[in-house]
């Protein structure tokens, strides 16, 4: 099971997550409690192992700005959390993840129309797109087509206590966590470690 730790804002946490086995780190460039500047993200990314994916999170940003930040920072993927469409996705010269909030099985079916490398299923948006710490009914994704499952990233309120059930129900390619590995709004390296251990163990 691949694991992504999202909302990285400092190099110490980023390095610790990599040491504990994180496969991907997320950097939020949209409005969020975890927003980071391109300059700071680049500084962190330069310190990371080459095999760890570096994913930039954007919401309704222009293709030009997304591509510029991706190139400057050394991102490997971009994650689109807004109302982006296939026209915008096709114009991006980088691997792409489209995020969708899940309220019904229809959302899973709608995901198949996006011409993207991965689909991230998340809880419905609130004040911020993602990182709200709330789960959704994983059973809605239980009858996912095999081809879609192979490129599914599961997010939304995941933590060390519920990750086993989430993986067992959805069987995604990757799981994505942010608030579930925080204490009082800050990344907690011990929670990151425990989350990664649980996610990797229950997928063996």
From Swiss-Prot:
Keyword Isomerase: yes
Reaction equation(s) it catalyzes: N-(5-phospho-beta-D-ribosyl)anthranilate = 1-(2-carboxyphenylamino)-1-deoxy-D-ribulose 5-phosphate
Upper lineage: Bacteria, Bacillati, Bacillota, Bacilli, Bacillales
InterPro entries named among the record's database cross-references: Aldolase_TIM, PRAI_dom, RibuloseP-bd_barrel, TrpF_fam
Enzyme class: isomerase
PANTHER family given in the database record: N-(5'-PHOSPHORIBOSYL)ANTHRANILATE ISOMERASE
Biological processes, Gene Ontology terms: L-tryptophan biosynthetic process
EC number assigned by the record: 5.3.1.24
Pfam families in the record: PRAI (PF00697)
Organism: Bacillus cereus (strain B4264)
Keyword Ligase among UniProt keywords: no
UniProt KW keywords: Amino-acid biosynthesis, Aromatic amino acid biosynthesis, Isomerase, Tryptophan biosynthesis
Family: Belongs to the TrpF family.
Protein name: N-(5'-phosphoribosyl)anthranilate isomerase
Pathway field: Amino-acid biosynthesis; L-tryptophan biosynthesis; L-tryptophan from chorismate: step 3/5
């Amino acid at each position: 099971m691949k694991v992504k730790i999202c909302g990285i804002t400092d190099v110490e946490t980023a390095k610790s997550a990599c040491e504990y086995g994180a496969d991907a780190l997320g950097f939020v460039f949209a409005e969020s409690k975890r927003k980071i500047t391109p300059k700071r993200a680049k500084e962190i990314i330069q310190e990371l192992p080459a095999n760890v994916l570096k994913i930039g999170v954007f919401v309704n940003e222009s293709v030009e700005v997304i591509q510029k930040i991706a190139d400057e920072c050394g991102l490997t993927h971009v994650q689109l959390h807004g109302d982006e469409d296939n026209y915008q996705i096709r114009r991006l010269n980088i691997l792409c993840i489209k995020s969708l909030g899940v309220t019904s099985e229809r959302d899973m079916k709608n995901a198949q129309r996006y011409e993207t490398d991965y689909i991230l299923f998340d809880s419905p948006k609130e004040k911020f797109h993602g990182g709200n710490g709330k789960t959704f009914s994983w059973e809605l994704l239980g009858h996912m087509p095999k081809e879609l499952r192979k490129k599914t990233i599961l997010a939304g309120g995941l933590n060390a206590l519920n990750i086993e059930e989430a993986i067992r129900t959805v069987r995604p390619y990757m799981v994505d966590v942010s608030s579930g590995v925080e204490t009082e709004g800050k990344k907690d390296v011990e929670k990151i470690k425990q989350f990664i251990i649980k996610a990797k163990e229950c997928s063996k």
